[in-house]
Curated annotation (Swiss-Prot):
Keyword Translocase: no
Protein name: Probable transcriptional regulatory protein ERGA_CDS_03720
Organism per entry: Ehrlichia ruminantium (strain Gardel)
UniProt entry keywords in alphabetical sequence: Cytoplasm, DNA-binding, Transcription, Transcription regulation
Gene3D superfamilies for the chain: 1.10.10.200, 3.30.70.980
Amino acid sequence: MAGHSQFANIKHRKGAQDAKRAQKFTKLIREIIVATKQGLPDPEFNSRLRSAIITAKKENLPKDRIDAAIKTASGNNQHDNFEEVVYEGYGPGNIALIIQTLTNNRNRTAAELRHALSKYNGKLGESGSVSFLFNHVGLIAYKASSINSFDTLFNTAIELQALDVEENDYDEEKMYYVTCNIQDFGNVRDQLFKKFSDAEFSRLFWKPINITTIDDEELQKRILNLMDVLENNDDVQHVDSNFIFNTKI
């Protein structure tokens, strides 16, 4: 299906993060803390918190740690004052990268990202240096096996003013990706949750307008190594990009 490669890297990177349990939990807890601080501590009245809790449960974060993170968010510990900062840059092969972080120290995070990108022949750019290559959208992802009818999902999503519903057969497990405008994200996500149950994951996503195909295997390896370094950084929540590999390595 046209456009499916725009989502090709999401599943791989999500799986790569799963390999490190403690680090994965750290990222989940940060998202819960930030979501709680931005609204009420009750997920029924805070859609971002609800989504964070759903994701945390799917990743087997213990309930007591979820509850503790929500409680922590109501405190005044300056070390838990995370802010959302988006960094833009280029990686090897001139691929475009948008790095979404939750950090309590902008200077530290920027320095670490700059070092990582430089090591792999990339560079950290200014705000706006690569974001024009992407559309910023809401993303709700379902396993195809959890949806009885693609047509029903498609029609429901479009009625909710979603932009598109796309099938991704790039991964071994087929996925359906619903995209919507940022301002509609909370409503589209919540209404889909009610009708089709909770999604596999949902988040704000930088969707590439065009895809750069990487053919060279050595370049592919350098890109994967950079992605590992970026996503092993505790401050990094997501890395969105505009590349796809011609062959899997």
